[in-house]
Amino acid sequence: MGRPQRGDTAKERRERQDKVTSPPESGPISQSGLSDTVDWTSETNENMWLAYDFDERKDINQARGQDIHRDQELFDVVLQNNMSDDQFASTSASVSDDWYDTGFDQAFLQPSSTSTTAYSVEPSPFISIEPPTLTKETKKRNSQSSDSSKPSSTSSQSLIERVTSLNLDLHQQSIIAGQIVDEFGNIDPDMIDPLHKDNRLSFAVDSMTQGLQNFHSLLLEIINTANGTTFSSESASPHVNRPPIQQQQSPSRFLAPPSRSCVPSLFCFREGNSSQQQSKNNATGIDLPTSLMIISCHIHLIRLCRHVFAGIRAALSSKDQHQQALLVLSSCQVGGVSISHDSDLKLLILIQVVARLINKIGVLLGYPCSPADLSNSAVGNLGNATEDERKKMLLPQLLRFVLAQEGVAGQSSHGDGMEGLREEIRKLNEVLATS
């Protein structure tokens, strides 16, 4: 039997497809029929794969066309939506994955994660402020200025604390000395027992002399710190731009100069061309609170001296108790020297020492006259001061007010200041002269 024609093959293919789709008839199947069925099935399957392959390719191409058309529509929609936003026009779809925040004010675009090489971050638009690079000379100059300013501020603070402490101590000592004078004033002189254990006159004398020396030493140190001058025992003239005397040195190193012309006054820093004078002498000046504290110390010190001399005069008022009172005072030391052989001589030396120290303190405070000229009855006058001496005063009006209250400038006073001290010393000299 020959090979079938192409037309018959198509016809047979349709018939065979109909047979395959129709259910087989029930009944016994013979061996020959089974073999025929297998042959038909294999041939049919071979032809069917060809048909299905063509149909599948057709369906796949159609699906691909639909997907391409759908993607084109989606791309058109996205493009239309993003045309109004230029920010995302040049970015890719992976921008959201590669965007990270490095701070509240900086944001950078990280390179692609597929790159394994090191990357450099773009510079921030914000300029970082860094300290300028200092040269060696600038660093050395800054270190020297800081080192020199720290000891100066520390020394000034220490001096202020010492002035405050001394002012409080002098105030308390003056109150105690005033109580001693009141006790002697309320008791008959013949009933006073200088040898009594409660007699505090000897301690009052010690506190007076020690207070004068401490105040004079501290006043010199304050002036030295303020204007950079130092007094030493080798020379009477001040040495400019030398470091101030250390605190551990004994007060005996502070020697007052013999004349007023070479003494830097406490009240000479804020008049006229004071800024030029300060820059010339490297002077820092003395502030107003420190100046007022110094004046307060001076007032309490003069009051203490007046009370002490009033107590000594009251103890020596009785002739019977005169020798006993001198025996009590004989234990006192004047300037570290004890004179036990002659008590009258000791009292005279005590008066001279107090007068001398008060004169030195007055000159350092800028008094244009000798406020403690206790040997003379005449009182100094501010009118005797020269024009240069007036310009040296820091607060002329305040100084005049203080001197007027203390009875220095020939004005009336309540007998509680310098004039009262002069009166007490004059009366004590009379007692010593009649003894």
UniProtKB/Swiss-Prot annotation:
Region listing for Disordered, in residue ranges: 1-40, 115-158, 231-257
Record key words, sorted: Nucleus, Transcription, Transcription regulation, Virulence
Ranges of Low complexity composition bias in the record: 143-158
Superkingdom per UniProt: Eukaryota
Compositional bias ranges of the Polar residues kind: 28-40
Main location: nucleus
GO CC annotation terms, alphabetical: nucleus
Cell compartment(s), UniProt: Nucleus
Compositionally biased residues, Basic and acidic residues: 1-19
Record's function text: Transcription factor; part of the gene cluster that mediates the biosynthesis of GKK1032, fungal natural products containing a macrocyclic para-cyclophane connected to a decahydrofluorene ring system that show potent antitumor activities.
Name this polypeptide is given: Transcription factor gkaF
Species of origin: Penicillium citrinum
